[in-house]
Amino acid sequence: ARFIDRIGKGIRGAPRDALIADITPPEIRGAAYGLRQTLDTVGGFAGPLLAMALMAATQDNFRLVFWVAVLPAIICVLLIIFGVEEPEATRPPAQLRSPLRRENLRRFDTRFWWLVALAAVLTCARFSEAFLLLRAENVGLAVTWVPLILIVLNAVYALSAYPFGKFSDNGGRRRLLIWGIVLLIASDLVLALAGNIWLVGLGAAIWGLHMGATQGLLSVLVADAAPADLRGT
């Protein structure tokens, strides 16, 4: 199930970010991506909160939690079908073909490839949220209350993403990226040394700040560096 979930995330992520870049003026692109991150993360905050309440009320009925989680996904599909208007293609349909072509790859400049390398390095330093939950259990948090850690992370992420996005529109993108990396290092250190649930919560909060500072920013930088007709690629 987790594997299929990651496939779904991979499919939806690129076209979603490309669509935002297509319909947003460049001068407010950081704020737009920040707002998108905030709204997306509200679900990550409300979801664990609801899961925790359901687990407590149903004596850890995991099956019911997953059935309830299906409903927001269905609503999202309906919104895409009936509420999202896709911009016109930049090329005639007859010219649309597989993007994995050598001539297309040559159109990405050095800035873009440096961003790809940076994102790859950041991914190596940022472990899965599953390990964060395991860390919470490791220091003694009961399984019913483990989602609290995700609530802390996503609450901080949601509250910080839009302000960080606005800041990046004011010419602070390089500084914001550096501070985002510093926050990731700090989070990893706190979680590695944590001996109680309070320090795990602090590490999760710092991780949320890192996500708020970098996730939307990386999308903005890619949108700025990539040719308009290859942003989804």
Locate predicted features.
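Cytoplasmic membrane-interface "Motif A"-like loop-to-helix N-cap segments
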Residues: 170-181
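Transmembrane alpha-helix termini and helix-breaking/packing motifs in multi-pass membrane transporters
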Residues: 46-66
